Amino acid sequence: MRLSDYYVPTLKETSADISVISHKYSIRAGLIKQIASGIYTWLPLGLKVLKNIENIVREEMNKSGSLEILMPLIQPASLWKESGRYDDYGSEMLRITDRNQREMLFGPTHEEVITDILRTTPVSHKDLPLILYQIQWKFRDELRPRYGIMRCREFLMKDAYSFDKDFSGAISSYNLMFKTYIKIFQKLGLTPIAVKADSGPIGGNLSHEFHVLANSGESTLYYDQDIIELMNSESIDVEKIKNTYTAADDMHDPQACPISSDKVKISKGIEIGHIFHLGDKYSKPMNANFCDSNNNKLLQMGCYGIGVSRLVAAIIEVFHDNKGIIWPETVAPFKFSLVNLYTSNDKCKKVAENLHMQLYDDVLYDDTDDSPGIKLARTDLLGMPWQVIIGKSTVEQDLIEVRNRLTKDKVLISTEQFLNKLKK
């Protein structure tokens, strides 16, 4: 893709009131554009990142045996009144009335809708366990939206809901999602910290939050340093992770902490996921049952959320330097930045055009007439994993310069050798 044909409205600076790195870089790199407080348009580059994250989430959810659906954003208020949660979200829930004066709402979450689906269709014990999920936009009218897409009012979320026959089955589904979440975050290049959490307005009696360590995080985490190795391991041991001490600030009691103070690490964290064992919190008031040997029994439920759009901010918070974003390859909008420093030089142009043709879908090709300094600063800001630099002196030696954005390693290599490496 040629930069001259693409829409990337980059900025040199942002307003002084923007303090968080991910907010600053997502605006400067032209990923998003604010249209109202806490509400953003996703521009081409940002949308590519968002879709890449979405695809990783979808891939791992599908591998777990979960089935994708899509539920409506607008929900009837009657379902929330039936579950007893209508007033729990207070002013965060945006309520509306349709032309027939029926009370509706913009869904901040979908427990009521999914429970209604299961209770109005015959469910046998043979259909269980069942996990349904969606990737859908949500709206919560935050009192103080801040930090850009990290805490906004409209956001993209993956929410899943499990249905089981009994407590044992529900915990198995909970553990399956626990493991699946770790796999998702590992694929994104993140090391999550799972901490026991309060269930809040979602409800239930067992809950874990997943945080990524970042100085801009709103939560303070206390954890056994061994948790890092466990969360990075390819062989994920859910029970061992659960039994390793971790706690957010509202759950940490220094007097009751089971490990010595010298083993307790303290860091800031950004919440990127939350899972809940719900039991019959929704199935009981909404009368959602399954049939077992001609007897109706209440479905045992769980729910599981990942902030897909928030992950964009979290990744930037973890992967950046003072020049810009450093995208992991799994989520990068393009794998390569191709920079022709001298577009008026025939040899530079010929080499660059050839590479653009070879790398077409994986490259953002800066073919503009901007100065070399502006081009190099822009490619650092945009943060593609690999930078391919075409300059006069290197081209005269039939070489190109390839830089790794993360490690800063550089190598001079012929175009032929470079393309051959990509084929391997």
Curated annotation (Swiss-Prot):
Keyword Cytoplasm in annotation: yes
UniProt-listed SUPFAM superfamilies: Class II aaRS ABD-related, Class II aaRS and biotin synthetases
PROSITE patterns assigned to the protein according to its UniProt record, in alphabetical order: AA_TRNA_LIGASE_II (PS50862)
Main location: cytoplasm
Cellular compartments annotated: Cytoplasm
Catalyses which reaction(s): tRNA(Pro) + L-proline + ATP = L-prolyl-tRNA(Pro) + AMP + diphosphate
Subunit structure: Homodimer.
Family label: Belongs to the class-II aminoacyl-tRNA synthetase family. ProS type 2 subfamily.
Function summary: Catalyzes the attachment of proline to tRNA(Pro) in a two-step reaction: proline is first activated by ATP to form Pro-AMP and then transferred to the acceptor end of tRNA(Pro).
Protein name: Proline--tRNA ligase
Organism from which the protein derives: Ehrlichia chaffeensis (strain ATCC CRL-10679 / Arkansas)
